[in-house]
Amino acid sequence: MQAYINRGDVLLKMNRTEEALAVYKSALNYDATNHDIHYNLGVVALEQGRPDQGLQYLNRALELDPQHKEALLNSAIVIQELGLPHLHQLAHGRLLQLKDLAPENERVFFNLGMLTMDDGNLEEAEGWFKKAIILKKDFRSALFNLALLLADQDRPLEAVAPLQQLLEHHPDHVKGLILLGDIYTNHIRDLDFAESCYFRILESEPGHVQARHNLCVVWVEKGQLEAAQTCLEVICLLLFSILS
């Protein structure tokens, strides 16, 4: 049985999902109650863009082994990503169960944050994101979502610290640079720093429309109207090339 699972795992890593699917289904003929096989079938379904069926397999794995860590995590992620609010309580319970089983897994806390944020429990979500970051200081998604959560709650100055930590570890994080530039433009009013954020994006992505637009706004705020006008003309050309 383990040979089937190992072969399926290798095929899955090689992105040969149809062959992996066939191997796992063959394995079911020998052991229909093997939780790992059902879990792996769920992974294949997710890889193939069939999340509903993937969730069914993950649920079956949990029926056979209620403490299957990977199935607990991935089923909760699928529920959250599919936008199934009627199953959020189930996903929340699975993540809390997994938190006790794997207290050092930062992804558990992050996904608790995402789930509770979707449910509008913003204070609780903030706490989960912060716990995820304690466990993994360079956790890209947790740092950005914490900053975004704070900014959306009209707490932009508090969002600066997680953004700085994000950019310390991931200096080319475009969304982080956009958000930090916006905060420095509209709240801190340090236009030179905001300008530098957008230049950093444009160095690697010259055609990034939002970064260039925000740079135009900075130049208007600085009174550099000629530069701003030229900047807007460049945006028009970029949009024309995108739409044509």
Where are these regions (language model features)?
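Core solenoid repeat modules with strong leucine/isoleucine-rich periodicity
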Residues: 57, 61, 66-76, 91, ...
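Structural marker of alpha-solenoid helical repeat scaffolds
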Residues: 30, 64, 101, 135, ...
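Amphipathic alpha-helical repeat scaffolds of TPR domains
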Residues: 69-78, 178-182, 244
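Residue-level recognition of tetratricopeptide repeat
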Residues: 9, 43, 77, 114, ...
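Structural signature of tandem alpha-helical TPR/SEL1-like repeats
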Residues: 13-26, 47-60, 81-97, 118-131, ...
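Helix-start (N-cap) detector for alpha-helical repeat units in TPR-like alpha-solenoids
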Residues: 1-2, 35-36, 69-70, 106-107, ...
